[in-house]
């Protein structure tokens, strides 16, 4: 399991980036038989001034998480939207 968490002060921008990132990651997941769930607002959708979205990817145990090189991921995310990648998250 891998949880990608996005946050930003602009709701529409953060939502749009989450949607675009999920679309981009879908092909990586499908090739490796992983499932992509989301994006969806986090359970607590706003903390302070930041809106939070998440994407969950889940796949066969013992297989490598199908993410592109991180330098490519960072190019997809504008500076005012933050991405956190949580492998084997303790909480969803």
Q: What kind of region is each of these model predictions?
A:
Residues 1-92:
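Accessory helical-bundle/CTD segments and flexible terminal tails appended to RecA-like ATPase motors
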